[in-house]
Amino acid sequence: MPVYVDYETPADLAERSLEALEVARDTGTVKKGTNETTKAVERGNADLVIVAEDVSPEEIVMHLPELAEEKGIPVVFVDTQDEVGHAAGLEVGSAAAAVIDAGDADDDVEDIGEKVAELR
């Protein structure tokens, strides 16, 4: 497990998070990539942050979980950058993504946030 991963995300929660990201991408607003995700978290605009566990070097996303926790934003860890990128609508992998406006996935994002709070 990478240094920046605070807790083990259950597979079903990771899958629900990726599905919520896909719905938010189509009906709301998402930010893709480490830089855009970091800006969204710093501004307090993000409702949910998804970070891949296979990022190398780890320092690229190491700051995100701590920053999101300071802002009260739930963070979900998924296995690969390809999963994050695909769910965010990219043809390539992405180390991180943020849901800004959940759109039709609003209830799912809220429920995911509650489950993440229980895991921490």
UniProtKB/Swiss-Prot annotation:
Its main location: cytoplasm. GO terms for cellular component: cytoplasm; ribonucleoprotein complex; ribosome. Keywords: Cytoplasm, Ribonucleoprotein, Ribosomal protein, RNA-binding, rRNA-binding, tRNA processing. One of its GO terms (molecular function) is rRNA binding. This is Large ribosomal subunit protein eL8. Part of the 50S ribosomal subunit. Probably part of the RNase P complex. It is found in: Cytoplasm. Signal peptide: none annotated. The keyword Oxidoreductase does not apply. It comes from the Archaea. InterPro entries: Ribosomal_eL30-like_sf, Ribosomal_eL8/eL30/eS12/Gad45, Ribosomal_eL8/Nhp2, Ribosomal_eL8_arc. GO terms for biological process: translation; tRNA 5'-leader removal. It comes from Halorubrum lacusprofundi (strain ATCC 49239 / DSM 5036 / JCM 8891 / ACAM 34). NCBIfam families: eL8_ribo (TIGR03677). HAMAP family: Ribosomal_eL8. Multifunctional RNA-binding protein that recognizes the K-turn motif in ribosomal RNA, the RNA component of RNase P, box H/ACA, box C/D and box C'/D' sRNAs. Belongs to the eukaryotic ribosomal protein eL8 family.
